[in-house]
Amino acid sequence: QYENAWDKEKQRSYSKHRTTVGKLVNGKVQLGRKFLANNPQYKDIEFKFEDHKLIAASDLPTVNDAGVNAVLSKTFPLNAGASYVLKEIAQQDGLLGDLKAVFPHHWKDLLALAMFFVIYPERNLANYDITAAHSQLGGNPLDSQRISELLESITADQRQQYMKRRLNHSCGGENNNFWAFDTTSISSYSEILSKVAYGHNKEDPEMPMIKIALLIDETNGEPLYYKVLNGSIADVSLLRNLFVDLAQLRDKQINLVLDKGFCSEHNFLMMFRNHVGFIAGLRSDLAIAAQTVDQLMPSLRLALPEYYSPTIGCYCATKQIDWYSATRAHGKEQYPFYIHVYYDKQREASEILNMTELVESFKARLEKGEVPNAPYFRKFFKKKKDKPDGVKPKDLYEFDVQSWVTFTRTCGCFVLGSSEVKSAPEALNIYRQKDMVEKAFNNYKDKCGGRRIRCRECALEGKVFITYLSLCLRLMLERRLEKAGNDPLNTPRVLERLNSLVLYRHETDDKPKLYWQGIPQEDRL
């Protein structure tokens, strides 16, 4: 018991009167000895503390076992914390509104399936109905047949409408914001999917695959656009398809970040003509890149302070050239092009050391009578002239010193090209953010069930769309965690803890009532 009063001089409240009754133990009041000595009449009475009052247990209403069992039989625990957070994020970032607009009859089921992939990445859709019955995912606990029907019902026009809405919400391409574009391969065991084909599969060259192209907003990390492609299509030939799609989806200028896989004079000219800003990794065998490296590297290797940029931690220099083109279709064209050359001494030492170890391993294999079948072996070892074919491999091949000199000339060097960004440090900082698209692919494959494609032809596009939605939700969650000072790598653990929070659903004759279990202090904001 206590009574507070106001101190006018100190302008604060203070305790005017306080009486200690006892302490609270497991919901029951344990009266203190001093209080009982002064109030012996309360010795044998059990008290509980409710609504900030001491109430005798005998005055509380009693509930018989039959009533308790009746309530419990209509009350079901649901894992709900993770789905609640993901749905709130979807609501705040506009994803939920876009789903409702494009899929007015199925948005709940689509969102539920996407959240299922995020929360339970190790499970497949065959377990969805069982999991959904014990989770607050929303939508209906669909069985495999109903899921297939839902996936098949998602049309190309609906997917285009949805991505158009997401692209228009993005600020990419405005105020010098960039979108990162890249592709990944997904292996498939299917022998009937039309887009499955053999190509450059980094994970398993012996397996056919499909390709997924993905466009990521570097500002907020959200995937904005994706496309399922034939597995045999090379990266260098994809940009034309991208521009055609984006022209239909968005009428504002875009800026792209591209890796070396898209580096070709044809692609650069196509981006110039389409007024697409870009920062791209340049291959060393590209003529304009090789010429610029030869001109700038001698100065950079001197490590003069004027070439050092502390913001990127390496030496850099820029050369502006004019990109010329003359064709019958377009006439004479001229565009400004900025070539940024970077030199990192630590990277140089690492590249030389790694290649030295690889060369030594080739020599050891030759000593054993093996001829390595590797590009770098063919680059640094040449067949000796006038040697019969029957000699031992170690006597048939010799180390090519000139190739090694050519290799070391560009060690520690890397080159970027840009149509817009004139500053070398700024260009590299933007390019480094491209690792978001790499992380997105890893999340797609490892955390969202995208390592293998197992579905029928008619459901393929729908399955990829659901996985794309789940990737959006996961990356949005990671960005929230990062802004709050948490490590995004802890996302699986955060999801697991959130999913342990229970929501009780009590069925009534009218509308089901929902009650949250007490949330532990460490999980509260």
Predicted regions and their residues:
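Glycine- and acidic
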Residues: 108-117, 133, 222-229, 251-255, ...
